[in-house]
Regions:
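Activation on terminal intrinsically disordered regulatory regions flanking enzyme cores
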Residues: 1-2, 21
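Extreme N-terminal basic, low-complexity initiation segments
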Residues: 2-9
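A short alpha-helical cap/connector motif
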Residues: 14, 22, 26-28, 33-166, ...
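Structural detector of well-ordered beta-strand residues that form the stable sheet scaffold
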Residues: 169-171
Length: 218
């Protein structure tokens, strides 16, 4: 099974590389940028593509919540994190790069599931708002229902933590950039169930649920 997927991924990367190479001559004809610049950009794009498929392949056995014993956690993975339903709002939210779109759609589903009454304003607001049109976006909140923070933002995390209760959910974005920091958040006595999606982590604070750290293929 693994060799097949490796071959499949390699073929996709080769196809992507050839497609981008085919565009270089057209770009070169229309612009004054050196060919070498576009070649370097193409190489990096293909490398990023390969990395995405490698991450996906390394977590393939963590897909769709299989093996999760808790019905609540399984349902969250299956019907929120990896929900495949083609929401009508997705078409209206298109236009961003692949990672912004991938995370944005997840945030849409989180807002749709959590239905927060109030959230902090951020660059993903249109995704949150599409998921829950009743949400009010403000600069400061008194209680966390659903929030997002970058893994590097230590002060932001502490500020949110002081406003959390058992129903709070925090998305920690970019955990792949600082695994040490993410593992500390997983082990923190203030946190409960956590979900590692590689591109972001989701933290619950419900102490009535058994503390568990899940790695999910997202």
């Amino acid at each position: 099974m693994v060799p097949f997927f490796l071959l499949f991924i390699s073929l996709i990367c080769i196809f992507e590389f050839r497609s981008k190479i085919g565009c270089i001559s057209e770009i070169q004809r229309k612009t004054s940028f050196p060919l070498v610049f576009h070649s370097i950009c193409t190489i990096f794009a293909v490398m990023n593509l390969f990395k995405r498929y490698f991450v996906w392949l390394s977590r393939i056995h963590k897909c769709r919540g299989f093996g999760i014993q808790s019905p609540t956690d399984y349902s969250f993975v299956r019907y929120v994190i990896n929900e495949r339903w083609p929401y009508y709002a997705y078409e209206q939210l298109d236009g961003d790069n692949w990672l912004t779109s991938k995370l944005g759609r997840l945030y849409f589903r989180l807002a749709n599931w959590r239905q927060p009454s109030m959230m902090i304003q951020d660059e993903y607001q249109r995704y949150w708002q599409a998921g829950c049109i009743e949400t009010n976006f403000v600069p400061i909140i008194n209680k966390v229902e659903l929030a997002r923070v970058l893994v590097e933002d230590y002060d932001g995390w502490e500020a949110l933590l002081s406003k959390c209760d058992q129903k709070s959910v925090i998305v920690v974005e970019g955990i792949w950039r600082d695994w040490e920091r993410w593992h500390k958040l997983e082990a923190d006595e203030n946190t409960g169930v956590t979900f590692d999606l590689y591109y972001c982590g989701i933290v619950f604070f419900d102490k009535n649920r058994f503390k568990q750290n899940y790695i999910i293929n997202f």
